[in-house]
């Protein structure tokens, strides 16, 4: 039968970039299911409140959704940053970021793969980051996002025969609430950031959601194992 838009699960889909992704996939015709610790900003078909860093809770939530919905799309979006210079990186912080930024991707994929295979296809998208190319104060964050990109390429090879594609979107500077708190619009530092972006603007959650929408479309079935940088040209400028 091949891939069809049925239910899409978005981890960390309640706010920021995740909310934009959730809204776009809803617009595209998916049922949308959000796994997060806070209520979603967007209209969704189901919301499960869960701390995805808790392994047992994550497994339980994913199993619940797999039983309730025909999941053919998974967007692994949940993540935290925790910037720090190398000298200040702590082992416990490494565990925390791996448990939030990476492990839920595996837990959720394992829960939804049987349904995707039975349906004849699926879409998995990782929300990574341009920091995989290098950025100061991002030792742990870049490690987890780089691992996600490598994992996506491995999964693309394993799952391709089942009609399941696996790709990454890697945002650059995106105007989330956290970004604007740290970089007020009228601050000189913010203008410096804009001046270093070839398209001369800060990205939006919708820019990232557009890229996710492409990877989750039936027409994207011949694209897998790829990373699309949504960065306004920063990675090449």
Regions found by a protein language model. Give the residues of each.
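Conserved glycine-rich cofactor-binding loop
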Residues: 14-15
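Conserved NAD(P)H cofactor-binding loop of Rossmann-fold oxidoreductase domains
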Residues: 77-82, 233
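Substrate-binding pocket helix/loop in short-chain dehydrogenase/reductase
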Residues: 85-86, 93-98, 189, 193
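Active-site loop-to-helix junction immediately N-terminal to the catalytic Tyr of the SDR YXXXK motif
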Residues: 89, 135-143, 154
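Active-site helix of classical SDR
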Residues: 109, 144, 152
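Alpha-helical segment proximal to the catalytic Tyr-Lys
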Residues: 114, 157-161, 221
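Short, small/polar-rich loop/turn modules that mediate ligand/substrate recognition or access, typified
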Residues: 160, 165, 223-225, 231
């Amino acid at each position: 039968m091949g891939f069809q838009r049925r239910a899409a699960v978005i981890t960390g889909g309640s706010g920021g970039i995740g909310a934009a992704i959730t809204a776009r996939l809803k617009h595209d015709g998916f049922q949308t299911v959000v796994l997060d610790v806070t209520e979603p900003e967007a209209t969704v078909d189901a919301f499960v409140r869960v701390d995805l860093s808790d392994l047992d809770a994550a497994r339980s939530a994913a199993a619940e959704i797999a039983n309730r919905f025909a999941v053919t799309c998974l967007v692994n979006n949940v993540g935290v940053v925790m910037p720090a210079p190398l000298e200040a990186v702590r082992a416990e912080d490494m565990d925390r970021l791996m448990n939030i930024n990476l492990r839920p991707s595996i837990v959720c994929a394992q829960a939804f793969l049987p349904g995707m295979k039975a349906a004849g296809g699926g879409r998995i998208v990782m929300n990574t980051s341009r920091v995989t190319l290098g950025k100061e104060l991002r030792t742990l964050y870049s490690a987890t996002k780089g691992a996600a990109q490598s994992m996506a390429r491995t999964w693309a090879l394993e799952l391709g025969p089942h009609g399941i594609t696996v790709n990454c979107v890697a945002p650059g500077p995106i105007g989330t609430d956290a970004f604007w708190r740290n970089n007020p619009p009228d601050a000189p530092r913010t203008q410096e950031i804009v001046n270093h972006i070839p398209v001369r603007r800060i990205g939006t959650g919708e820019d990232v959601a557009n890229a996710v929408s492409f990877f989750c479309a039936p027409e994207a079935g011949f694209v897998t194992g790829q990373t699309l940088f949504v960065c306004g040209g920063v990675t090449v400028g």
